[in-house]
């Protein structure tokens, strides 16, 4: 779907523009890449820098979601005649699983930064204890996106490296294709249920820590 692809590309320059603007106006967004409140809330960052950064992330996120939808629909609907899913190249599988992870995790990040935006500008208190909110909630939402995001970065590499190894060692086909497909699907699925291992220092109870440690070790 070329127009959809085109739109997902042309959302990126305005996103970059907003990001650059956020570093130019006021004092810039000095929040680190995780954008945790209260450092990213009005108390610590009064100006419009963080707001611009949030809008930039929104545009980049929409762009990624459109790209992911495009990949998934292309692979489902536009394979060559007679090519079943299990006969697809491993790299294509890796990209599809990556696209599904993007599609599932990005809306959660969008929700988290939208809540941060309303906390900053519309007087809500999702992440402000003074109004009954909890800054830890932001960390949960962020890492529910942030952990699958690591696999989004690494999965295409799994596919590529398998192809490179089979090509460079003059094999006829990639070794263990089906096993790799299931392994990538499994790591994609498990990636969604281990997010809190990024936040062991915020005071979770022992049962929760035990679960997240065990689930992480299973990966």
Curated annotation (Swiss-Prot):
InterPro entries according to UniProt: Cyt_c_oxase-like_su1_dom (IPR023616), Cyt_c_oxase-like_su1_sf (IPR036927), Cyt_C_Oxase_1 (IPR000883), Cyt_c_Oxase_su1_BS (IPR023615)
GO BP, sorted A to Z: electron transport coupled proton transport; mitochondrial electron transport, cytochrome c to oxygen
Cofactor note: Binds 2 heme A groups non-covalently per subunit. Binds a copper B center.
Pfam families per record: COX1
Binding annotation for O2: 151
EC id: 7.1.1.9
Residues bound to Cu cation: 147, 197-198
Transmembrane intervals: 2-24, 48-77, 90-119, 135-168, 177-193, 206-219
Segments on the Mitochondrial intermembrane face: 25-47, 120-134, 194-205
Gene Ontology MF annotations: cytochrome-c oxidase activity; heme binding; metal ion binding
Pathway(s) annotated for this protein in UniProt: Energy metabolism; oxidative phosphorylation
GO CC, one annotated term: mitochondrial inner membrane
Location in the cell: Mitochondrion inner membrane
Similarity annotation: Belongs to the heme-copper respiratory oxidase family.
Function: Component of the cytochrome c oxidase, the last enzyme in the mitochondrial electron transport chain which drives oxidative phosphorylation. The respiratory chain contains 3 multisubunit complexes succinate dehydrogenase (complex II, CII), ubiquinol-cytochrome c oxidoreductase (cytochrome b-c1 complex, complex III, CIII) and cytochrome c oxidase (complex IV, CIV), that cooperate to transfer electrons derived from NADH and succinate to molecular oxygen, creating an electrochemical gradient over the inner membrane that drives transmembrane transport and the ATP synthase.
Record protein name field: Cytochrome c oxidase subunit 1
